[in-house]
Design a protein with these regions (language model features):
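Generic beta-strand structural signal
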Residues: 80, 92, 103-107, 115, ...
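Canonical Radical SAM [4Fe-4S] cluster-binding loop centered on the CxxxCxxC motif
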Residues: 98-135
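Conserved AdoMet/S-adenosylmethionine-binding subsite of the radical SAM
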Residues: 144-153, 158-316, 320-323
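Auxiliary Fe-S-binding modules of radical SAM enzymes
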Residues: 1-92, 244-253, 258-356
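Glutamine-centric residue-chemistry signal
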Residues: 30, 110, 136-139, 310
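P-loop NTP-binding catalytic core
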Residues: 88-102
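Conserved alpha-helical substructure of the radical SAM core
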Residues: 123-153
């Protein structure tokens, strides 16, 4: 019989499981603390449990491992990148970024991605599978254990589309912010989506307080379609309406992410179109000079051109910043480290969700 993934149980579910094996409910609190506060990787670490109970747990459950196979430390800024191997041999990436206000971790939500964004390394091999809730959590846990640094902020902007792994992602948010676990404030969690419209509306009604970051990347429907196959399924107007719904239901300002690609979406017309889209919305625009990858032809504009683009938008009343580049010397972009360490090289066509 396959062992159950005990780390993916939330607090209430774990209480039910512990009752089902004939143990008292208070044991669930002890076990949950070992898993989600003390970050235990083996049942034998749980020293306030009897040996008999530890053996009983080991027979029915497992703490699925997330093994570090590569660890890069930037020499130019306080950024570290991790390549993790999962129990089935698949590999995922995470990044630790240290700031004055605390430590932020960027995690993956899928093995690969089927969204097919033209400038993104993580889509090149297509989607292998969704990550479980425990695999998302354990990226953070492993980084805390390895570095001894407490994580205060989490961004779900690594490999994968979190709203394409909806149920596991939402459960992850609840468990990450649970008072019985790491208890990270939902307001310190940001999730990026390329714009799966029905799931943005669904997320708006979940009662969460996370920040939604919408991958815009094109100032019009036609430009988005050239960069993001998902735009063949959802019109820009639909995506913006969904973002408005998220703001209306949660009170949380939406961030719009915009990868600046030289000669593609960084011209005067783009400034005008972005102004029209964003000026009357309570939002923030984050400009991201694109990370060049060898499999794609895209180049980022020089810093002067990027600053000019930002300044023109600011003059038009747009709340806009340029994202500071982090980890430029350590395969900092999503998917680069995974491919370097032997992921499948065959490039796959865009999958069903991106088709007309």
């Amino acid at each position: 019989m396959e062992k159950k993934d005990i780390v993916s149980y939330n607090y209430d579910e774990l209480q039910d499981e512990i009752k089902s094996i004939g143990e008292k409910p208070f044991r669930a609190k002890q076990i949950y603390a070992w898993l989600h506060e003390k970050l235990a990787e083996e049942f034998d670490e749980m020293t306030n449990l009897s040996k008999a109970l530890r053996e009983k747990l080991d027979q029915a459950y497992e703490i699925r491992k997330v093994k570090v196979v590569a660890h890069q430390i930037s020499k130019v800024d306080p950024t570290e990148k991790f390549l993790f191997e999962l129990e089935d041999g698949n590999r995922i990436e995470s990044v630790l970024m240290k700031y004055n206000y605390g430590n932020s971790v960027c995690i993956s939500s899928q093995v690969g991605c089927r969204m097919g964004c033209r400038f993104c390394a993580s889509t090149l091999d297509g989607l292998e599978r969704n990550l479980t809730t425990s695999e998302m959590l354990r990226q953070i846990y492993q980084i805390q254990k390895m570095t001894g640094e407490r994580v205060s902020n989490v961004v779900v902007m690594g490999t994968g589309e979190p709203l394409d792994n909806y149920d596991n992602f939402v459960k992850f948010i609840h468990m990450l912010s649970d008072e019985h676990g790491l208890n990270i404030s939902q307001r310190s969690i940001t999730a990026s989506t390329c714009g799966i419209v029905p799931n943005i509306h669904r997320l708006a009604g979940e009662g969460l307080q996370i920040t939604l970051a919408l991958s815009l990347h094109g100032s019009s429907q036609e430009k988005r379609k050239k960069l993001m196959p998902i735009a063949n399924k959802y019109e820009l107007s639909e995506v913006l309406e969904a973002c408005d719904d998220y703001y209306k239901q949660t009170g949380r300002r939406v961030t719009f992410e915009y990868s600046l690609v030289a000669g593609v979406n960084d011209g005067p017309d783009d400034v005008k179109e972005l102004t029209g889209i964003l000026k009357h919305r309570n939002c923030h625009l984050n400009l991201i000079p694109v990370n060049p990858i060898k499999e794609r032809d895209f180049k980022k504009p020089d810093s002067k051109k990027a600053m000019e683009f930002q300044n023109k938008l600011e003059k038009n009343g747009i709340n806009v910043t340029i994202r500071r580049e982090r980890g430029s010397d350590i395969d900092g972009a999503c998917g680069q480290l995974r491919r370097r360490y032997g992921a499948v090289i065959e490039e796959r066509p865009d999958e069903d969700i991106c088709e007309d």
